[in-house]
């Protein structure tokens, strides 16, 4: 997927080596990026230890929030696919003890939601 897909809210797969380098300042020593997806400016990163959600804020994207969720804290997740009239897909992640989802991300109609679901299933099951 290209630049236009990213602007439209479609997630695209990123090079794990590039993300490893970009997030080197927050990764633990020996922690490896296993999969990464870009959604507009935000990142969904799966490492061998945790899920990292990168939320770039503001016009320039200089202000950045890094949300780290250890896999053992994820109690469940759901994926809602796009339909005929509702064109958005949605990913929700609950953490232990929470009634409401801790993470809710919307995607435009694309197939990458299935790839993200597969990675989540692999690390949480």
From Swiss-Prot:
It holds the Pfam family bPH_1. Gene3D superfamilies: Bacterial Pleckstrin homology domain (2.30.29.50). It comes from the Bacteria. InterPro entries: PHb, PHb_sf. This is Uncharacterized protein YjqA. It comes from Bacillus subtilis (strain 168). The gene is yjqA.
């Amino acid at each position: 997927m290209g630049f236009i897909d990213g602007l439209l809210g479609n997630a695209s797969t990123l090079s794990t080596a590039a993300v490893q380098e970009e997030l080197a300042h927050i990764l633990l020593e020996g922690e490896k990026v296993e999969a990464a997806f870009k959604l507009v400016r935000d990142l969904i990163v799966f490492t061998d230890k945790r899920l990292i959600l990168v939320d770039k804020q503001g016009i320039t994207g200089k202000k950045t929030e890094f949300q780290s969720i250890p896999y053992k804290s994820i109690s469940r997740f759901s994926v809602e696919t796009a339909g005929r009239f509702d064109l958005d897909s949605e990913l929700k992640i609950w953490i232990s003890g929470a009634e409401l989802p801790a993470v809710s991300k919307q995607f435009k109609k694309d197939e990458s939601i299935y790839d993200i679901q597969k990675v989540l299933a692999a690390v949480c099951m």
